Curated annotation (Swiss-Prot):
HAMAP family: SfsA. InterPro entries: SfsA, SfsA_C, SfsA_N. This is Sugar fermentation stimulation protein homolog. Transmembrane segments: none annotated. CDD domains: SfsA-like_bacterial (cd22359). PANTHER family: SUGAR FERMENTATION STIMULATION PROTEIN A. Belongs to the SfsA family. GO terms for molecular function: DNA binding. The lineage of its organism: Bacteria, Bacillati, Bacillota, Bacilli, Lactobacillales.
């Protein structure tokens, strides 16, 4: 996935939940951030940041924040990116769902029961499936973790996947880590222990959990390699005083 109309500037500060200030060639611009996470270890003043110009007179801001460079790697924090990447790869067959024959019929944003899941589809052999995608921006070294903030919505989605699996669908929980050079993925138990329990139960009932890292830059994010997932691995956040 490549972005157009991209510029690189310097992050000044986070102003509000959805707004940061970026210095673009000496001009301070308010920039929309499409990510509700805490992102404390990413939004460090002085960091390089990439933004996309949006030509929309009805908007209060003219730019969207795409990625921030931290410790030599670009971290994509566009919360819409994981679904775009997943859709492209599912349709192209470059993201293979274990046990399901290619090609896939892919239908985004499908409602099942009282939940809306990111993707529904059917494999070449007729097996129906669901995929719920979660973007991941929290990491410490080569270990990534989800969530960055408590999320009851994610628990609800996992419960829905578990029910769908019991009714004959093949259900998948897909984590897309929005930065490169990640070797393992876990759930941040200290942040939201209920999610660990929900995922463990889902796996025991046949739900498949997949995790991938990505190749990122100021103007791109593409699917990388599948990485091991273990919801029980311990995780601790980066010490901000060391940054």
């Amino acid at each position: 996935m490549y972005y157009q109309n991209v510029s690189v500037g310097q992050l000044i500060k986070r102003v509000s939940r959805f707004t940061v200030e970026i210095d673009l060639n000496g001009t301070v611009e308010p920039v929309h951030m499409n990510n509700t996470g805490r992102n404390k270890e990413i939004l460090i003043p002085g960091s390089l940041a990439s933004v996309r110009y949006v030509d929309n007179p009805n908007r209060k801001t003219h730019y969207d924040l795409l990625a921030v460079q931290r410790q030599g790697r670009w971290i994509n924090i566009d919360s819409l990116a994981p679904n775009h990447v997943a859709k492209e790869c599912l349709e192209a067959g470059t993201l293979k769902l274990p046990g399901l024959a290619l090609p896939y019929a892919v239908h985004p944003e499908s409602t099942w029961r009282d939940s809306r899941l990111d993707f529904a589809g059917k494999a070449a052999d007729g097996q129906s499936w669901f995929v719920e995608t979660k973007g991941v921006t929290l990491a410490n070294g080569t270990l990534a973790a989800f969530p960055d903030a408590p999320t009851t919505r994610a628990v609800k989605h996992v419960h829905t996947l578990t029910m769908a699996q019991a009714e004959g669908y093949q259900a998948f929980l897909l984590f897309i880590v929005q930065l490169p050079d990640i070797r393992q993925m876990t759930i941040y138990r200290d942040r939201f222990p209920e999610l660990v329990t929900a995922i463990t139960t889902a796996k025991q009932n046949g739900v498949r959990v997949l995790a991938y890292d990505t190749m990122t830059g100021p103007d791109q994010i593409t699917l990388g390699n599948e990485i091991p997932f273990d919801e029980h691995l311990p995780f601790s956040e980066i010490n901000l005083n060391s940054l």
